[in-house]
Every structure is written in structure tokens, then in C-alpha cells.
């Protein structure tokens, strides 16, 4: 389990997060949504250890994140940020291998190579394997970056859980790859995985998420199962937009229609 207890965070005089608490269970797809500037990405960065100056407590398996060594943290959690660009040319297979860096000292072993090949195949990137990363489109880069973070936590942990943090992972992806991406994530959480993604598309979130967490102005407004919290009143309160929420005739899940 991953827990946040009374998290507050400020940049200068601006308070980004205000006394936010939440729990995230393994085996469930957790998605954070909210308007721009609501603190979603900052919340994710605190969980991943990228931001370490904050008030409150983050617990990995009941162990404080500030007590985890960087090497230990790197082996159990992976982060996919919004920025997919690299400042130097690498082959796609080399970028994916970057996800294995925490697991070896000098050179990758046979297991590292096997894992990268499995991930590349799973993400349908075999034809891109020897392409220069900088020549790829934005959507192709996103897929490679997802393969990289999957490679980092591909192995099932001997004890405890693995953690995957995705910050707006669907940027630049077309519809088919959005679903491929989310389906791969759903498969991953079945094996001792805590998964948290920052999302913008409410209907995709309603389709794939087990739990939704709504942030607004740095505060946790509401959280729960999509069918319980995706109501017209809550959506208007969080996003200041009028909607009609109906049952998807195919999936039975909430479907948000904008007025």
C-alpha cells in the first residue's frame, strides 16, 4: 500500500497542496484528476520522491519515503513524466534499457536484455528497436518512455510491491494507442503493483480506473469509485462545467456528456 498523510507543499508563498491525505491499494488503477494548477503533478512528484521538501508523510509499505535509500527506491518505483524528449541521440532499445540502470552496476546482464525485449514486444515497438529516438514522433516517444518505465519495474518483487507513477501519459497518443497503453497498465497491476496516473480525460478514467481522486486548488475534493463520484454535481464543483452523466450502454460505466 502507498499512503499520503496530511501532505502540504508550497513554492515560495504559493501553497500548492493543502493537507492532502490518500491511500492507494495494489491491484487497482488509481487516477488523479482536476483542473490545471490543482496540484496533480506536484502530488505525484512527492509520491515518487522527486519533490522531497514537503510537510506530511508518504509511506511505502508502512516505511517512510524519506527513510528509503535512492537505490532502493529506484528498484521499486518508476516514473513517467510529461517530458518525453532527450537531449542526445540514442536507439530506442537503449532508451528502454535506461529503465534497467538501477538493477546493474556496469553492464546489463542476460536478464536485463530479456526484460527489455519482452517490454519492447509488449508495446509493439519491435520495428522501432534500432531507430534513433530523436527522430520519433511525439506519440512514438511516449510509447518508448512507457516501455522504459515498465522495464524498470518489470520483475515481480520478492516481497512488498512495485510502484508506477504516470504523469499525463496519454499526451500525443492517438486513440488506439491510448487504449493499448491503458490496457497494458491494467495487466501490470494484477501482480503486486500500485499504479497512479494523472489524467485529463474523464471518460477514459471512468472506463479504466478503479478509483478516482479529484484535486482542486490543492485540496482533495472527493475520491472513490467512478460510479459513486462521477455525478453532475461533483463534476461541476471540481471543473466548473455542466454535464450530463449517463450509463455507457456498452460497458455499464459512467459516461460524461458535456452540455
What is the meaning of each model-derived region?
Residues 56-64:
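Conserved ABC transporter NBD signature motif
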Residues 33-35:
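The feature captures the beta-strand-to-loop junction immediately N-terminal to the Walker
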Residues 2-4, 16-19:
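Conserved structural motif at the start of ABC-family nucleotide-binding domains
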Residues 132-136, 140:
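Conserved ABC ATPase signature
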Residues 111-128, 165:
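Conserved ABC ATPase "signature" region
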Residues 48:
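Helix-to-loop junction immediately C-terminal to a conserved catalytic motif
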Residues 212-226:
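H-loop (His-switch) and adjacent beta-strand-loop-beta switch element
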Residues 232, 237-259:
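ABC ATPase nucleotide-binding domains
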Amino acid at each position: 500500500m502507498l499512503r499520503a498523510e496530511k501532505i502540504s507543499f508550497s513554492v515560495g508563498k504559493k501553497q500548492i497542496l493543502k493537507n492532502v491525505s490518500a491511500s492507494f491499494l495494489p491491484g487497482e488503477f488509481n487516477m488523479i484528476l482536476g483542473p490545471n494548477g490543482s496540484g496533480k503533478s506536484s502530488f505525484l512528484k512527492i509520491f515518487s520522491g522527486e519533490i522531497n521538501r514537503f510537510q506530511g508523510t508518504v509511506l511505502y509499505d508502512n516505511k517512510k519515503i524519506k527513510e528509503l535509500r535512492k537505490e532502493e527506491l529506484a528498484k521499486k518505483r518508476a516514473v513517467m513524466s510529461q517530458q518525453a524528449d532527450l537531449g542526445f541521440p540514442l536507439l530506442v532499445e537503449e532508451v528502454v534499457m535506461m529503465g534497467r540502470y538501477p538493477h546493474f552496476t556496469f553492464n546489463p546482464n542476460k536478464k536485463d536484455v530479456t526484460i527489455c525485449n519482452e517490454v519492447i514486444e509488449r508495446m509493439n515497438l519491435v520495428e522501432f528497436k534500432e531507430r534513433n529516438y530523436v527522430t520519433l514522433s511525439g506519440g512514438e516517444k511516449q510509447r518508448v518512455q512507457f516501455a522504459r518505465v515498465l522495464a524498470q519495474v518489470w520483475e515481480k518483487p520478492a516481497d512488498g510491491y512495485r510502484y508506477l507513477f504516470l504523469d499525463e501519459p496519454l499526451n500525443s497518443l492517438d486513440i488506439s494507442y491510448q487504449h493499448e497503453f491503458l490496457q497494458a497498465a491494467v495487466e501490470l497491476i494484477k501482480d503486486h503493483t500500485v499504479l497512479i496516473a494523472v489524467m485529463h480525460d474523464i471518460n477514459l478514467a471512468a472506463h479504466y480506473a478503479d478509483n478516482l481522486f479529484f484535486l482542486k486548488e490543492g485540496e482533495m475534493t472527493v475520491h472513490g469509485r467512478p460510479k459513486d463520484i462521477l455525478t453532475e454535481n461533483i463534476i461541476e464543483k471540481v471543473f466548473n462545467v455542466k454535464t450530463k452523466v449517463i450509463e455507457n450502454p456498452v460497458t455499464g460505466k459512467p459516461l460524461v456528456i458535456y452540455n
